[in-house]
Design a protein with these regions (language model features):
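Short acidic/polar capping segments at secondary-structure boundaries
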Residues: 30-37, 47-48, 55-56, 64-69, ...
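Short, conserved clusters of charged catalytic residues that mark active-site
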Residues: 10, 59, 108
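Double-stranded beta-helix
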Residues: 67-134
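Short, compositionally biased
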Residues: 136-138
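Short, hydrophobic/aromatic alpha-helical segments in well-folded domains
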Residues: 14, 46, 60-63, 129-132
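Non-heme Fe(II)-dependent double-stranded beta-helix
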Residues: 1-52
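Glycine-rich, flexible loop/turn motifs
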Residues: 1, 37-39, 45-46, 60, ...
Length: 138
């Protein structure tokens, strides 16, 4: 299933419109946040977490289920992609779905925007945008 999603023509066309036709899918990840399990994704930058340079790539997030603030949708720090890479601390919280636990401290939540998506919708973001997600409270 993940291979089909990663090579979906609509997704590839959207990515191509941003970075050109030389596209490489370097990985896929599922973040499963079931109700009551307490999982979250700490605020981080994919450029720091993944470590690919130059930063001329994008990350695609495809919602498998409806995603909203109540069930812990992704939040992005608006405009943070215009800044340099931020310092990340190692935070090995067992509930953090990032396996390496990289965390940006003191992200001003009032500057973050929830990415509310319906199942099947997609968000593309720059590798230096600060993003994370809260707990699933449903």
């Amino acid at each position: 299933m993940l291979d089909e999603v990663a090579h979906n023509e609509n997704i590839l066309n959207a990515v191509e419109s941003l970075i050109g036709s030389n596209i490489l899918v370097c990985g896929t990840t599922l973040f499963i946040k079931n109700p009551g399990e307490g999982g979250f994704v700490s605020y981080h930058q994919d450029a720091k977490y993944i470590g690919l340079e130059p930063h001329n790539w994008v990350t695609a997030w495809v919602a498998i289920t409806d995603s909203n603030e109540h069930n812990g949708c992704m939040r992005v720090w608006s405009g943070s992609h215009k800044d340099n890479l931020k310092d990340h601390d190692q935070n090995f919280n067992e509930r953090n779905l990032l396996t390496r636990g990289q965390t940006i401290k003191n992200v001003p939540k009032k500057k973050t925007t929830p990415l509310i998506l319906k199942a099947g919708q997609m968000s593309l973001h720059h590798p230096t945008v600060v993003h994370g997600s809260d707990l699933n409270h449903s």
